[in-house]
């Protein structure tokens, strides 16, 4: 009998500000650090999560990924994120594909959806349409956010490409996207976030120390390595993961796409 198993990651960092810096800045640098602390931790956690997902899809969840990116330059509509692409991704899970209701994308992909949503189509094909007008309907009329697409709530995060989909020379830049459901990706903590501060009178410094001990876990998967406290690079390593459910019972799909808003190549 297989058991699901998460791996705990221990993370910590510290900052120090000396009196000379305060005098030179004429402000409170430590105050600025405190104001940015929550955003900084979220950014670090997101990078860790997407490293985790890249590792899972390396081998263990290989059956649940769809790559429509062009193996070269000059990608076209078939290589972009479209409703058709979403349908193909749902199909990987069979009848359970209908459960997928969250779409996680890079901002560059999201702004392409925004661009397309501001068009009124008089033809059936984006690539061959000749009578397209801006501002006719869809998103962007009163709200710049891409709230939903193809039946999914859209979550935008630049950390999705923490692990690059490809680095093949001459390939147009590729982007990961993830389809999932609420409750598939879980977060647990071994101990709560701890923030400590003190004054070092010898060095004339204010010191701030932060540590947290948490785990991300995708239902139906397991950490398949004897070691614990992995780095992000270890989390992204394919052979360190396994699945304990059949792949189509795990509501998580990875897509790899291009976008016309970034035509740069590796």
Regions found by a protein language model. Name each.
Residues 1:
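Active-site loops and adjacent core secondary-structure elements that bind or stabilize anionic groups
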Residues 19-95, 240-265:
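Alpha-helical scaffold segments that mediate packing/assembly in large oligomeric complexes
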